[in-house]
Curated annotation (Swiss-Prot):
Phenotype when changing residue 938 to A: Decreased cleavage of target RNA
UniProt effect for mutating residue 2 to A: Decreased cleavage of target RNA
Application of this enzyme or protein: Can be used to detect low levels of cellular transcripts, which might be useful to create sequence-specific RNA-targeting tools.
UniProt subunit comment: Crystals show the 3'-end of target RNA interacting with an adjacent protein molecule, and mutagenesis of those amino acid residues decreases target RNA cleavage, but it is not clear if this is physiological.
Any one GO molecular function term: endonuclease activity
Region (Linker) residue spans: 814-946
Annotated region described as Binds crRNA repeat and spacer, given as residue ranges: 1-11
Region annotation Binds crRNA repeat: where it falls in the sequence: 139-151, 172-176, 224-233, 271-276, 294-297, 301-305, 336-340, 371-378, 780-783, 962-963
Identification of the protein by name: CRISPR-associated endoribonuclease Cas13a
Species assigned in the record: Leptotrichia buccalis (strain ATCC 14201 / DSM 1135 / JCM 12969 / NCTC 10249 / C-1013-b)
Effect of residue 1108 to A/R: Loss of pre-crRNA cleavage
Coiled coil: 880-946
Family listed: Belongs to the CRISPR-associated endoribonuclease Cas13a family.
Residue ranges of the region described as Binds crRNA processing site: 319-328, 1072-1082, 1104-1108
């Protein structure tokens, strides 16, 4: 679904349904705005000023454009009339020479436009020249009105003999309904093949391909003509069509018509049957065949349209040959039509669940369900990351799904004997892993766990398990009853004592104030701002965590980065922090950003976005500045003119309108035009913010850093404050020094979250997520809020904001051993095993300072969220190791990097903003090239040495696995809908998908896959071949190879980790096969992987062989283009190193070596 506008009316466009639906917010204004479509502005007939060469003509045509933008032709009672727009008429001098024939897009309109311009009377007959354009608009309006009235899908729920079922009511659906049962599938396919053979001979298709190969852009009509000859359309002349139509009036069935008109082509027979007889004759296996030529030809025409008539430049002749090879073409069309039949059956099942008797599936109804499903699938990453983190904390070797297995339980065997089965928590104690698990828990929850209290620990792990399972069973296992807003309800889960203490401590007022104090210290505020100024800032600032979900509000960091460039044009007073020491300058900027950011997101947005703010005053000022720019005054044309007529009176609605315009036009405009929207909004907020600071006496923050010399009392306190904060983390009972308390007393907080059990469980989940997943979750919840216009997830978003105060901070006291780092180090051909070897290896003190291991953030993340052993195996296979030489090179390059950054910065300024008499020379070009090459080399080396590349690899792998889990959820949903659609009378289908087997009547054992296999065997009990597909021997092989239904379990239960029994490429192959019932879904798998790779800076091409095996054709780094508009050879650097590209390629190919059988 996407939002669009047609003639100024907001719609939701459902591309799969092909219809436009009124947006709810527009319902009351639709008729009025539809009528407004008939008002046609005449400036559309005047050429753009920029299309002329001379400045005089640009200015003259600009004035014409402006004049005619206020003149409209409208239709009333079938008569055309002229009227003025809303703008006031301005007295002006005019002359016949002001408007020339060359200024008008179409010469036939020139005479009447000239009369209008010269203020001469124009009658309705003269206005008839615009009739055709008005007619086109009228057709558009009628189409829209029909769309609104037809605002429904062709499905209705009925009750037939006490069996609730859904049927399609369109003509196509009548055909599909005839073949609803899978037993008729073979006959359906046979009819498709037969129709294809009737329409197309192999030699004709071969000739068609030759014609396409020799095609030029201007000769596409020849392909159409040749194709029409193939299907016999040229023989159906107009008089022949009249003969057929006359006969149809007197003939009641297709057979009789063919007898009377025997010369009809196969296609014409099919089209006539579909149009005139399909819903009149009683369908049987014989007459229904008539419909299939029509179906096949539609698919063929669509292929020609996509690959020939509207052929894209990236479609090669080889691809055309493959697609249109006779047997391939036949199979492709067969699959497409089979997919459509399957989709119909699934839709019948879907609407059976959601509709009441007699109810029709409307487009709005469909959209709501799609939106809910899409939102829930976006949350899959939450459950999968949390699940991986749980496994990592437990250090479990269990390859099976561990949810529901925290506690041990007593079970009975076949003989009735009781046996205790250990839970995952039991294993911590049985395998003596208490210390390791305690350290792992501390990395996530920063809490001092008492591992000697086993019951308390078991309750805590059970809480985490229940919270994860609650989400997984709602999403991964597709819960029909679950609404998006209830995904984090965590019903019937009581927080354990540890959970309560931990969460209550997190939302404690004193702890929150200390977090803010830590941020002030980290941002170097105490070093660069005098004490009395800090205290004054704190007195005037309120720190809030409430989420401000406002569309199109620019981030503060984006605005800050543009202040220097925009300060003159916007009339802003600004002093950029600058010292002789680059590090010091950066620290001052960090402090300034932190202090200003709190004001921006707090009191400023509260004021600016309110009805009492000056939002509209500032926005008008920005438009006026653009309008009065010297260059625009000459032409009379200015970019921001398009925003002048926006009528919304509330800032939030104004922004939503601009965001809508941006999204609608994004695909049809060049980058410069798209940037206009973002640039306009950024200027409004930047000007508004700086005005707010000036009006509220807070501009003094501009001068931060200038009083450093007088701030001796706090300048050197950073480390002292850090030490205290670390001690306080370990013991909250220690006394807070007066010096810190003085600041804490002045920190004011907004409303603090109140404790609820639901938020307590949500908190446990959040602490298991990495920073990226937490950001994605926040975005998903904000989008849900916006789409549903409700306050759902407000508390959850506030909690995320609260945790973001320090969620991505590295805990310094996490355990890190030399042999863990040593897995990726090359010490004379071996891995480093202990501190002694690490000291010898690392003479540059990058990993070891002589006494202690230096802890890099990336390795902290790898240990906390990662797959250390799997990463080691992938790195070993890729030959990826850090050498002593690389450490030395890194240390040397580190000393030179500031010089290279400075060189790039200065030369880029010279290129982008040259001073008077300054020119970017060839020598500058070469120096810039050398600087960016040095920076690239250093950056890649740094990312390797500091383990950033391994951390990226882990994040990439995890992201791909999350996405694949989403596909298994869709498969489960589709299976459920297909079975319900095909067998609406079967009352036991729901038991296949019910997890509480003890409540089931028929399917009492096993998970979804096992229960479905039982159903499958019952369905095909008389077909030995199909039953044998899931024999015990075959199931054993399928499980081992993770094929067929068992790839679903392998992905959904996250069994790829830790051992990678099959490669990621094989996972993709097997998943595509599982999804082969839907071509779009199957093809989407690889597209989503390519998109994820692109997000991480890789450009990949996969190849799929005739045997359906997937391989990597190319995998390269994304290129970063520098000095884009310079008329020289493009300067490009690689975002990722070649070594990392190789590592990613190996990641896709890696799988655990098979154990050799012992003989």
């Amino acid at each position: 679904m996407k939002v669009t506008k047609v003639g100024g009316i907001s719609h939701k466009k459902y591309t799969s349904e092909g219809r436009l639906v009124k947006s709810e917010s527009e319902e009351n204004r639709t008729d009025e705005r539809l009528s407004a479509l008939l008002n046609m502005r005449l400036d559309m007939y005047i050429k753009n000023p920029s299309s002329t060469e001379t400045k005089e003509n640009q200015k003259r045509i600009g004035k014409l454009k402006k004049f005619f933008s206020n003149k409209m032709v409208y239709l009333k009672d079938n008569t055309l009339s002229l009227k003025n727009g809303k703008k006031e008429n301005i007295d002006r001098e005019y002359s016949e020479t002001d408007i020339l024939e060359s200024d008008v897009r179409d010469k036939k309109n020139f005479a009447v436009l000239k009369k209008i311009y010269l203020n001469e009377n124009v009658n309705s007959e003269e206005l008839e020249v615009f009739r055709n354009d008005i007619k086109k608009k009228l057709n558009k309006i009628n189409s829209l009105k029909y769309s609104f009235e037809k605002n429904k899908a062709n499905y209705q729920k009925i009750n037939e003999n006490n069996i609730e079922k859904v049927e399609g009511k369109s003509k196509r659906n009548i055909i599909y309904d005839y073949y609803r049962e899978s037993a008729k599938r073979d006959a359906y396919v046979s009819n498709v093949k037969e129709a294809f053979d009737k329409l197309y001979k192999e030699e004709d298709i071969a000739k068609l391909v030759l014609e396409i190969e020799n095609l030029t852009k201007l000769e596409k009509y020849k392909i159409r003509e040749f194709y029409h000859e193939i299907i016999g359309r040229k023989n159906d002349k107009e008089n022949f069509a009249k003969i057929i139509y006359e006969e149809i009036q007197n003939v009641n069935n297709m057979k009789e018509l063919i007898e009377k008109v025997p010369d009809m082509s196969e296609l014409k027979k099919s089209q006539v049957f579909y149009k005139y007889y399909l819903d009149k004759e009683e369908l049987n296996d014989k007459n229904i065949k008539y419909a299939f030529c029509h179906f096949v030809e539609i698919e063929m025409s669509q292929l020609l349209k996509n690959y020939v008539y509207k052929r894209l430049s990236n479609i090669s002749n080889d691809k055309i040959k493959r697609i249109f090879e006779y047997q391939n073409l036949k199979k492709l069309i067969e699959n497409k039509l089979l997919n459509k039949l399957d989709t119909y059956v699934r839709n019948c099942g879907k609407y059976n669940y959601y509709l009441q008797d007699g109810e029709i599936a409307t487009s709005d109804f469909i959209a709501r369900n799609r939106q809910n499903e899409a939102f829930l699938r976006n949350i899959i990453g939450v459950s999968s990351v949390a699940y991986f983190s749980l496994r990592n904390i437990l250090e479990t070797e269990n390859e099976n799904d561990i949810t529901g297995r925290m506690r041990g339980k007593t079970v009975k065997n076949n003989k009735g004997e009781e046996k205790y089965v250990s839970g995952e928590v039991d294993k911590i104690y049985n395998e003596n892993k208490k210390n390791e698990v305690k350290e792992n828990l501390k990395m996530f929850y920063s809490y001092d766990f008492n591992m000697d209290n086993k019951n308390e620990i078991e309750d805590f792990f059970a809480n985490i398990d229940e919270a994860i399972s609650s989400i997984r069973h709602g999403i991964v296992h597709f819960n029909l009853e679950l609404e998006g807003k209830d995904i984090f309800a965590f019903k019937n889960i009581a927080p354990s004592e540890i959970s309560k203490k931990m969460f209550q401590n997190e939302i404690n007022e004193k702890k929150l104030k200390l977090k803010i104090f830590r941020q002030l210290n980290s941002a170097n505020v105490f070093r660069y701002l005098e004490k009395y100024k800090i205290l004054n800032y704190l007195k005037r600032t309120r720190f809030e965590f409430v989420n401000k979900n406002i569309p199109f509000v620019p981030s503060f960091t984006k605005l800050y980065s543009r202040i220097d460039d925009l300060k003159n044009s916007l009339g802003i007073y600004w002093k950029t922090p600058k010292t002789n020491d680059d590090n010091k300058t950066k620290e001052i900027i960090d402090a300034q950003i932190y202090l200003l950011k709190n004001i921006y997101y707090g009191e400023f947005l509260n004021y600016f976005m309110s009805n009492n703010g000056n939002f509209f005053e500032i926005s008008k000022e920005i438009i006026e500045l653009n309008k009065n720019d010297k260059r625009n005054l000459k032409t009379g044309f200015y970019k921001l003119q398009k925003f002048e007529d926006i009528q919304e009176k509330i800032p939030k609605e104004y922004l939503a309108n601009i965001q809508s315009l941006y999204m609608i036009n994004a695909g049809n405009q060049d980058e410069e035009e798209k940037d206009t929207y973002i640039d306009f909004i950024q200027k409004i907020f930047l000007k508004g913010f700086m005005t707010y600071l000036a009006n509220n006496g807070r501009l003094s923050l501009i001068y931060i850093g200038s009083d450093e010399e007088t701030n001796t009392s706090l300048a050197e306190k950073k480390q002292e404050f850090d030490k205290f904060l670390k001690k306080y983390e370990q013991n909250n009972n220690i006394k807070i020094p007066y010096e810190i308390n003085e600041f804490l007393r002045e920190i004011k907080l907004g409303n603090i979250l109140k404790y609820t059990e639901r938020l307590n469980m949500f908190y446990l989940i959040l602490k298991l997520l990495n920073h990226k997943e937490l950001t994605n979750l926040k975005g998903s919840l904000e989008k849900y809020q916006s789409a549903n216009k409700e306050e759902a997830f407000s508390d959850q978003l506030e909690l995320i904001n609260l945790l973001n105060l320090d969620n991505n901070r590295v805990t310094e006291d996490f355990e890190l051993e030399a042999d863990e780092i040593g897995k990726f180090l090359d010490f004379n051909g071996n891995k480093v095993k202990d501190n002694k070897e690490l000291k010898k290896f690392d003479t540059n003190k990058i990993y070891f300072d002589g006494e202690n291991i230096i802890k890099h953030r990336a390795f902290y993340n790898i240990k906390k969220y990662g797959m250390l052993n799997l990463l080691e195996k992938i790195a070993d296979k890729a030959g990826y190791k850090i050498s002593i030489e690389e450490l030395k090179k890194y240390s040397n390059k580190k000393n030179e990097i500031e010089k290279n950054h400075k060189m790039q910065e200065n030369l880029h300024r010279k290129y982008a903003r040259p001073r008077k008499d300054e020119k970017f020379t060839d020598e500058d070009y070469e120096s810039y090239k050398q600087a960016i090459e040095n920076i690239e080399e250093y950056t890649h080396l740094k990312n390797k040495v500091e383990f950033n590349e391994l951390n990226l690899l882990q994040g990439l792998l995890l992201r791909i696995l999350h996405r694949l889990v989403g596909y298994t959820s869709i498969w489960e949903r589709d299976l459920r809908f297909r079975l319900k659609g095909e067998f609406p009378e079967n009352q036991y289908i729901e038991e296949i998908f019910n997890f509480e087997n003890k409540k089931n009547v028929k399917y009492k054992g096993g998970q979804i896959v096992e229960k479905y296999i039982k159903f499958y065997k019952e369905l095909h009990q008389n077909d030995e071949v199909k039953i044998n597909k899931y024999s015990s021997a075959n199931i054993k092989v399928l499980k081992q190879e993770k094929k067929d239904l068992y790839i679903r379990n392998y992905i959904a239960h996250f069994n790829y980790i830790p051992h990678a029994e099959i490669s990621l490429l094989e996972v993709l192959e097997n998943l595509r096969k599982l999804l082969s019932y839907d071509r779009k879904l199957k093809n989407a798998v690889m597209k989503s992987v390519v998109d994820i790779l692109k997000e991480y800076g890789f450009v990949a091409t996969f190849k799929i062989g005739a045997d359906k095996k997937i391989g990597i054709q190319t995998l390269e780094s994304e290129k970063i283009v520098h000095l884009k508009n310079l008329k020289k050879k493009k300067l490009m650097t690689d975002r990722n190193s070649e070594e990392l590209c190789k590592l990613v390629k190996i990641m896709f190919e890696y799988k655990m070596e098979e154990k050799k059988s012992e003989n």
